[in-house]
């Protein structure tokens, strides 16, 4: 029995490379949809590279696309994303690209065209404007930042 919350929202997508798959969620409950590499590349240890995915999307205003690493490749190979998560704004219409980095200290990572390289999550966001004030309201935490709540 399905309810409206289980039905995914639709996002317009433009396939820029007809040979590549569209993003896909492997399981119905998966938050992220796999993105595929539009090119074959080798990433040397400690290096980064911008890789296209062969798609462009039109996100609704009030949503954002967040690009996350794939956990298996991060664990097994050290493949990650430099600006995790990558941000796709609702008004961006260009090709989605992923800034990949090889965090392994010794082994190059080979990515073949059509391989899964990242996950795209689409989330609702609160759109805000900013209002300058002289002072901020007091809180229990105050200005205490990094490490201020302890290590355990």
UniProtKB/Swiss-Prot annotation:
<feature type="binding site">
    <location>
        <begin position="87"/>
        <end position="89"/>
    </location>
    <ligand>
        <name>substrate</name>
    </ligand>
</feature>
<feature type="binding site">
    <location>
        <position position="83"/>
    </location>
    <ligand>
        <name>substrate</name>
    </ligand>
</feature>
<keyword id="KW-0378">Hydrolase</keyword>
<keyword id="KW-0479">Metal-binding</keyword>
<dbReference type="InterPro" id="IPR008181">
    <property type="entry name" value="dUTPase"/>
</dbReference>
<comment type="function">
    <text>This enzyme is involved in nucleotide metabolism: it produces dUMP, the immediate precursor of thymidine nucleotides and it decreases the intracellular concentration of dUTP so that uracil cannot be incorporated into DNA.</text>
</comment>
<dbReference type="InterPro" id="IPR033704">
    <property type="entry name" value="dUTPase_trimeric"/>
</dbReference>
<keyword id="KW-0546">Nucleotide metabolism</keyword>
<feature type="binding site">
    <location>
        <begin position="70"/>
        <end position="72"/>
    </location>
    <ligand>
        <name>substrate</name>
    </ligand>
</feature>
<dbReference type="GO" id="GO:0004170">
    <property type="term" value="F:dUTP diphosphatase activity"/>
</dbReference>
<comment type="pathway">
    <text>Pyrimidine metabolism; dUMP biosynthesis; dUMP from dCTP (dUTP route): step 2/2.</text>
</comment>
<protein>
    <recommendedName>
        <fullName>Deoxyuridine 5'-triphosphate nucleotidohydrolase</fullName>
        <ecNumber>3.6.1.23</ecNumber>
    </recommendedName>
</protein>
<dbReference type="InterPro" id="IPR036157">
    <property type="entry name" value="dUTPase-like_sf"/>
</dbReference>
<feature type="binding site">
    <location>
        <position position="97"/>
    </location>
    <ligand>
        <name>substrate</name>
    </ligand>
</feature>
<dbReference type="GO" id="GO:0000287">
    <property type="term" value="F:magnesium ion binding"/>
</dbReference>
<dbReference type="InterPro" id="IPR029054">
    <property type="entry name" value="dUTPase-like"/>
</dbReference>
<comment type="similarity">
    <text>Belongs to the dUTPase family.</text>
</comment>
<dbReference type="GO" id="GO:0006226">
    <property type="term" value="P:dUMP biosynthetic process"/>
</dbReference>
<dbReference type="GO" id="GO:0046081">
    <property type="term" value="P:dUTP catabolic process"/>
</dbReference>
<keyword id="KW-0460">Magnesium</keyword>
<dbReference type="Pfam" id="PF00692">
    <property type="entry name" value="dUTPase"/>
</dbReference>
